[in-house]
């Protein structure tokens, strides 16, 4: 069950099945390092730390801004309410998707810390075991048609749940060792009903395939994307 822990300037949302004491410094990488539970890291906009919980591995991410504005204001966001914080919205969106049967990481805990008119945020979520992103896989070998059908079906499930993934690209689609497809990274994504956002999601995904084809010579051809979209259209609710 999801619970909340509050004190004077912060709110923590957490899954009580996975986190017993949210007052522990679970959002500080130094805490996990001191207990020898850091299993790895990945660099992007910031460092994502992979840590070992009792029953699963988790990914710890501090929210950071990108682009030119991010160079000026790295990790502060305007506060407009606890439920409107980036971490709370991503946490809730993951729960919504899981309830809809979409393969996404399980949210473990999220924290927003308010300071004046701004806040900082962190998210602790499940690290999908034995999974690789499409870029990594396609650099080695092409995917069979059936796997593109699975990818299309998973995107359709997400769309049918009314979730607009505003950064859908092949770095954010994973395949695990059981050939299960996962979708990750839902920061700034949202529930949405009307508009052309489903089409825009697919256009963005297609651009990412073409970009990596030029950049890394991945094993991919446009026919693969047609298979993906055909499978998606069979499940997508208009």
From Swiss-Prot:
Gene Ontology biological-process annotations: lipopolysaccharide core region biosynthetic process
Top-rank taxon, per record: Bacteria
Subcellular location: Cell inner membrane
Keywords: ATP-binding, Cell inner membrane, Cell membrane, Kinase, Lipopolysaccharide biosynthesis, Membrane, Nucleotide-binding, Transferase
UniProt pathway annotation: Bacterial outer membrane biogenesis; LPS core biosynthesis
Active-site residues, Swiss-Prot/TrEMBL: 167
Keyword Cell inner membrane tagged: yes
Protein's recorded name: 3-deoxy-D-manno-octulosonic acid kinase
Main localization of the protein described in the UniProt heading: membrane
Protein family membership: Belongs to the protein kinase superfamily. KdkA/RfaP family.
NCBIfam families reported in the protein's UniProt record: PRK01723.1 (NF002475)
Molecular function per GO: ATP binding; protein kinase activity
Naturally occurring in which organism (per UniProt): Vibrio parahaemolyticus serotype O3:K6 (strain RIMD 2210633)
Membrane topology summary: Peripheral membrane protein
E.C. number: 2.7.1.166
Chain's role: Catalyzes the ATP-dependent phosphorylation of the 3-deoxy-D-manno-octulosonic acid (Kdo) residue in Kdo-lipid IV(A) at the 4-OH position.
Cellular component GO terms, alphabetical: plasma membrane
Matching SUPFAM superfamilies: Protein kinase-like (PK-like) (SSF56112)
Known catalytic reactions: an alpha-Kdo-(2->6)-lipid IVA + ATP = a 4-O-phospho-alpha-Kdo-(2->6)-lipid IVA + ADP + H(+)
InterPro entries the record matches: KDO_kinase, Kinase-like_dom_sf, Prot_kinase_dom
């Amino acid at each position: 069950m999801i619970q909340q822990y509050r004190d004077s300037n912060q709110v923590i949302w957490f899954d009580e099945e996975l986190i017993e004491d949210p007052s522990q410094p679970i959002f500080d990488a130094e805490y996990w390092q001191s207990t020898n539970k850091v299993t790895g890291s990945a660099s992007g906009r910031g460092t994502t730390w992979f840590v070992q919980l009792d029953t699963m591995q988790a990914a710890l991410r501090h929210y950071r801004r990108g682009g030119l504005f991010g160079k000026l204001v790295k990790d502060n966001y305007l506060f407009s309410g606890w439920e409107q914080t980036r971490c709370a919205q991503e946490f809730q969106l993951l729960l919504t998707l899981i309830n809809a049967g979409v393969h996404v990481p399980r949210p473990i805990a999220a924290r927003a810390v308010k300071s004046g008119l701004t806040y900082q945020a962190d998210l602790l979520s499940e690290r999908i075991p034995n999974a690789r992103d499409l870029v990594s896989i396609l650099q080695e070998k092409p995917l069979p048609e059936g796997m593109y059908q699975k990818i299309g079906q998973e995107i359709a499930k997400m769309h049918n749940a009314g979730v607009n993934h505003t950064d859908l690209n092949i770095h954010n689609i994973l395949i695990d060792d059981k050939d299960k497809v996962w979708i990750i990274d839902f920061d700034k994504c949202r529930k949405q009903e009307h508009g052309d956002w489903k089409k825009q999601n697919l256009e963005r995904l297609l651009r990412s395939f073409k970009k990596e084809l030029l950049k890394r010579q991945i094993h991919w051809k446009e026919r693969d994307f047609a298979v993906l979209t055909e499978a998606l259209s069979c499940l997508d609710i208009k």
